[in-house]
Amino acid sequence: MIGSGISGLTTATKISEHKSVEVTVLEQARHFGGRADVDVDGEHCPRFFMDDYTELFSILGTIEGQDGRSVRSALLNARRLSHTHTSGWVEISHLYRLLAREIPITERITLARQWRPSPLVADQQGRNANRFGSLRDYSPVGLLRMARNLVRSKTGYVLPGPTDVYLIDPWLRDLRRRGVSLEADRRVTNLAQHGSHVAVTTAMGTEVFDVVVVTAFVPDLVNLLDASKIDHIAVDSGNTHCVAYTIQLDPREKVLADASPAMYCRDGVNILVQPGHDRCVVLCTMATRTDPDHVLAKVRSYLELDRDLVSVRCRVNQRPGEAVFVGDYVRSDRLLRRPMRGLYFAGSAIHNSYPIDAAEGAVRSALAAVRAIRRDYDLEVAR
């Protein structure tokens, strides 16, 4: 596997179930997880698991988590609060506030009429690092998929705390127990046909594999195929970048008194409060500004914080691999203009049955790649 995001880890998990198969995961970064990683600047985003993540939940149910329970069992229901002009913060029963019965119909109509975001965040007044964070970046099909997903998903779950602690680290331990080789800081620079196999080149030399599954995010995928002189139709576009903050709170704050996690959403600022770890993770989607002065003032106001913040980390998410895909899916069987024996593709931007760029889509695309490999190579029955 090239890449250790959700799709790469899923592919490694399922392929490692087969006898006589050696599995290696190559990750270009110094740590694993892809966009589900946690680096020195904090979380990539508030990690939210929709209630229809059926395939991901199935896999997480097999992975032992921090406390001996499965990772799936450790997920917590997240309360969702939306701000209204008449009642202040209201806990709602639907992810999409315009469909939440707790908000009066008259106010929902007002909200719908008032929601006229500038098509370009750059057109808005104030300091904003949300590069391409605009509706113009969404393809019409992408917008339709997003709307459909908002309507049909009513609730969601979150991790008790940091993504690496509760998701990625347990998953890596599980893969190592399965005998999977995990190699970080191994950027792949070239792919080439080698007979019926695939030659993979990194800084450490060239290795030959029977099968290679590329799970890199679209910009990295395009760069790799171009560098390998492999003719393809993938396009490095349709990506949006959103700034995230990871904030450690004083444990005496009133917002932490309720032990259950909660998501506060207002004016394009989305705040996931994780009381079990005295912290919150903030994602600026359509916020008018993303600079610390503006965002931290919003967080203080929305959460009614009284004390100094313990620590603040800001992740601007400007690298190509940190984007969110909002373009049109690419079919894996049409990505290459000429088929290449032994080369497969997976990832949340690869065509799958989930409507938006999400962990569930990454899993479904990985499962499709695994099915194709099993068919093409007549793999032995799983253990």
For the regions a protein language model found, what residue spans apply to each?
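Mid-domain catalytic core of redox enzymes
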Residues: H18, R186-D293, Y302
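Helical element adjacent to the flavin cofactor pocket in flavoenzyme catalytic cores
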Residues: M146-T202
